[in-house]
Amino acid sequence: MKKGFMLFTLLAAFSGFVQADDAAIQQTLAKMGIKSSDIQPAPVAGMKTVLTNSGVLYITDDGKHIIQGPMYDVSGTAPVNVTNNMLLKQLNALEKEMIVYKAPQEKHVITVFTDITCGYCHKLHEQMADYNALGITVRYLAFPRQGLDSDAEKEMKAIWCAKDKNKAFDDVMAGKSVAPASCDVDIADHYALGVQLGVSGTPAVVLSNGTLVPGYQPPKDMKEFLDEHQKMTSGK
């Protein structure tokens, strides 16, 4: 009984310390005007990871020091963006909302944050058959560069709510219109995750390990890059 009571007391005390640390962080976030945030453990001692709609922050447990931007693990053969690696859970949670163009013989999977008003996004989509033929599966999420509540966001909402999302996306990228539609898909979730991953323009490509590759790359160049990246990260 005594051992059980002591263990309970220790756990309660530890929980109190954690809450106190989070309270200091929450106080700092409130001072900065950040209302919506998710506090998680950080990969280094004495800090917490804070996910916000404006990006990812690392804050010391006492709430006195802040670092903004990605954190890298350089202990291996190649640097690893541990911030984006951590965000893979959130990325995969949106998998059911992605517009997917699957390669018949899949070798690589990339997630592309796209905008229907982006010229290079159109160019990438026009070459979809070439990406797929090279074994590259493309998964789309929406990232309206003009922000939420823009005309582009409303049109992309209609695409993502269409009965046949792939056809609706193809039509819009070909210059056709799409009928207005509404559903449970929230483009704001796509946009917020893009910001957290470091997306600032489109197209932006996220690899399977969370690595962000900004900008357009032709199919063959993308395939070569993905092959090389796979070798580096696998240590082969």
Stretch-by-stretch model annotation:
Residues 2-9:
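Sec-dependent signal peptide recognition
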Residues 13-17:
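N-terminal signal peptide c-region/cleavage motif recognized by signal peptidases
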Residues 19-35:
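Short, non-transmembrane alpha-helical segments in secretory-pathway proteins
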Residues 34, 45-47, 54, 96, ...:
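Extracytoplasmic
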Residues 37-38, 47-51, 55-58, 62-74, ...:
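Thiol/selenol-based redox catalytic cores and closely related redox-interacting motifs
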Residues 38-41, 140:
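A structural preference for short, hydrophobic beta-strand core positions in alpha/beta folds
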Residues 76-99:
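N-terminal "domain-start" segment that seeds a small globular fold
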Residues 97, 101, 108-116, 120-182, ...:
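Structural alpha/beta surface segment adjacent to cysteine/selenocysteine redox centers
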